[in-house]
């Protein structure tokens, strides 16, 4: 399998044009036969996949009952997160994985595709043509 996604142009900054590597991922609800289509930033700096709070609601995940409280630190400082107790089934193209997932306590941070159980299970390339490539 080889799957390619173009980076998304996000505007300009003092340093020039900003492009972000996004990938289309399907997320399966653990409680019903529902697949949610989401675009996640491919973030090699993220230890694990972390999603905005609203996605938990759409997947019928109860942040109090289905998750454990945790915290994470990054460029924006320390944040409260909810760690899903069970792995979540996801699809990238036709490839299915079961991955660890956490949810932010807000909707301000976009979904981040992390390394653990996901990015690290593919040969992943970031091309200078602003394309991210996943190979299995």
Feature roles, as predicted:
Residues 1-136:
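Pepsin/retropepsin-fold aspartyl endopeptidases
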């Amino acid at each position: 399998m080889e799957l390619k996604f173009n980076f998304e142009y996000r505007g300009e900054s003092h340093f020039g044009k900003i492009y972000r590597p996004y990938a289309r991922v399907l997320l399966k609800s653990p409680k019903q036969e529902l697949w949610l289509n989401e675009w996640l930033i491919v973030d090699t700096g993220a230890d694990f996949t972390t999603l905005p709070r609203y996605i938990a609601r759409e997947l019928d995940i109860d942040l109090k009952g289905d998750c454990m409280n945790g915290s994470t630190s990054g460029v924006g400082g320390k944040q409260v997160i909810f760690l899903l107790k069970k792995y979540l089934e996801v699809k990238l193209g036709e490839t299915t994985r079961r991955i660890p997932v956490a949810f932010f306590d807000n909707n301000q941070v976009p979904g981040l595709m992390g390394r653990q159980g996901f990015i690290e299970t593919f040969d992943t390339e970031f091309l200078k043509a602003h394309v991210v490539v996943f190979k299995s």
